[in-house]
Amino acid sequence: MFSIITENINDGLSFVNEVTICERIISPILIFVSRNYERSNVWSHVSYNVDEKKGLVGEPDYLIAPRTKYGGMARPSLCIIEAKRDDFEEGWAQALAAMVASSLLDAKLCYGVVTTGKTWEFGKLEDSVFTLDPISISATDNLQKTFNIINWMFDKISKPV
């Protein structure tokens, strides 16, 4: 899987549009990592409507959350957004909205990721304080480090509080 993702990152066709970035790079990484975490499901492009009055409605690219006993999505603790047109600022606005929505559902800690597929940025919202990691990671230069960070986030959100 690692070699396929590496090939996809180096293939210009993977960056034709937002859909190909999601399908050829982001999804395979998330699905590969999630296989190690029974409770953490990858929810792709599902509605996440928490508070319409506060504007906390939408369809984030990916939410990582357990299933409810009825098969629906429980409160997510990790949000991954594809940075449309390489716009990280807009991507973080969308990610932070999903993270705040989770905090309204009593999440004390929520992680966020914004990526172009090649460049990955990481942040967290803890007790209403947002922290953006000042170092972005290049999957082109260090795919293993990208996997390690995503895996670390899955591990953190999979542990009981």
Region spans (language model):
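A short beta-strand->alpha-helix segment at the C-terminal rim
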Residues: 111-115
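A short, conserved, highly charged catalytic patch centered on acidic carboxylates
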Residues: 1-109, 121-161
